[in-house]
Regions:
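Short, internal active-site loops enriched in acidic
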Residues: 48, 107-111
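Active-site or metal-binding loop neighborhoods of secreted/extracellular toxin and effector enzymes
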Residues: 95-98, 103-105, 113-152
Length: 152
C-alpha cells in the first residue's frame, strides 16, 4: 500500500526529493505567473537505471489534444502536473510495462476527495508520498513558509 510520510519543509531535508522540489520552486518563482503560493510537487521515477525527477505545479499548463476544451491545455494540482510530466517522459523513453515511479513529494498533503484517489489509482503500491503540510488545516502556515522560502 502507498506510504504517506509527513516530513520537514526544508532545503536541508534528509530526502533528496524534498530538496529537489524546494530548490526548483525557489528558482521558478522568478518566472512570470508563478508565485510562492503555487503548490509544487516532484515525482521520482527510474529510467534506464537512473533516478529522475519530474516537476509540476498548480500554475503549469498541461497540453491537451485539440478540440476537446476551449484551450488546448488544462491546469492541474501540483502532484497531477508532476505525474503527467513523469508519465510523458516514461512513455517516450521506456519500453517496460512496469510503472517505474518510486516516490512523490507534494508541499500539501493530497486532498482525500480527488488527488489521493488519483494517486492510489496511478502510483505503484509500494510508492512513497511525502508531504509537509496538512490540507486544509495548515494551508496558512504553508503560505507563510513558502513565501519565506522564496523570499517574497
Amino acid at each position: 500500500m502507498m506510504q504517506l510520510i509527513k516530513t520537514e519543509y526544508s532545503l536541508n531535508s534528509g530526502y533528496p526529493i524534498v530538496r529537489r522540489t524546494l530548490e526548483d520552486k525557489k528558482k521558478r518563482v522568478e518566472q512570470p505567473g508563478f508565485g510562492p503560493e503555487s503548490c509544487c510537487a516532484v515525482v521520482e521515477y527510474r529510467l534506464r537505471g537512473n533516478i529522475r525527477y519530474a516537476f509540476g505545479n498548480s500554475r503549469m499548463q498541461v497540453s491537451m489534444p485539440p478540440g476537446i476544451y476551449t484551450h488546448n491545455w488544462v491546469r492541474l494540482h501540483g502532484e497531477m502536473a508532476a505525474l503527467v510530466a513523469a508519465i510523458d517522459r516514461i512513455e517516450r523513453y521506456s519500453t517496460d510495462d512496469v510503472i517505474p515511479i518510486t516516490a512523490a513529494y507534494i508541499e500539501l498533503r493530497p486532498c482525500e476527495a480527488n488527488c489521493m484517489q488519483a494517486l492510489r489509482n496511478i502510483l505503484p503500491e509500494d510508492a512513497r508520498v511525502y508531504y509537509s503540510f496538512e490540507h486544509p488545516a495548515q494551508v496558512d502556515e504553508w503560505k507563510v513558509r513558502a513565501n519565506e522560502l522564496c523570499r517574497v
